[in-house]
């Protein structure tokens, strides 16, 4: 007889997965482990479901990690560091401070617990690769742990159009792959500082992403007509550039009878999109002309040989550029009264938005 490890069990209202009970390929990250968890489902963009219920937040040792972007932890945390994965309903800080569950202050979370030997120290990984047609991938991840703080940094640069991985549960068709070439560079920093006495904590993250997508579509068509065949060539090119900057932070302070939480955020998105369209109809096959003549299709002055057989021509150029800036800060506080179950809840927020868009067309 051969003993097998228990893969999961319930501890009160918490569902606990034993990470060591799952066999994974060497070098696997957290995402590969979660895909094997019974009842768990990993979907596009890092969304996680357990027994059909959406997981609101993915935690690391009970703390936020790149809040709102699960993919950073999923793709960079080695599975061998994980001791267990706990799934449960977590009350917010205000509920814990007040001593009872407050409205809209509970989340369904997946909490990744690290093994003791990895709870203090450095960890990191680096990956690089290349392929045909000048495809490449390079990324790194490093993290520093102590019993009351954490600092993580990551970066990624690639021109891989398809970011899916084997085993993802996702509906896919060839149209999802997209056309053209997508180049992207992104990175970020995440930090957490916790007071040993639990009176305050500070956490936040900064992420930057640059992305450029270029696509060119060529279409050739022959029309069979009684009065003589005609030939058409159409070229459509697009270049889309984006710069995205996101940062969010949280400061929490807790006194004897009052607490305070501040949540500042900044989101910035800059875009620059260019479109060029050229089409030409001839009474003679395009194969009859040389490269120099055919290249003139993209210029204002059409080649003389093409001009002699031209039926109609269309040139269109477009440009769309602009930006969006959104900033906000919110504050909430709970004030307790001595020898009374009552309390006062205070909330305030302020926000600012600036957007600009310019559109140019030329025919």
Predicted regions and their residues:
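Extracytoplasmic
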Residues: 12-14, 43-45, 53-55, 80-82, ...
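Short acidic/polar hinge/loop motifs at secondary-structure boundaries
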Residues: 63-92, 147
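Extracytoplasmic beta-strand/coil segments of soluble accessory domains associated
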Residues: 31-66, 84, 94-104
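Short, acidic, small-residue-rich periplasmic hinge/interaction motif at the N-terminus
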Residues: 1-23, 43-45, 51-55, 89, ...
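Soluble non-cytosolic domains of exported or imported proteins
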Residues: 24-28
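Primarily recognizes Gram-negative and organellar outer-membrane beta-barrels
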Residues: 68-71, 91-134, 148-363
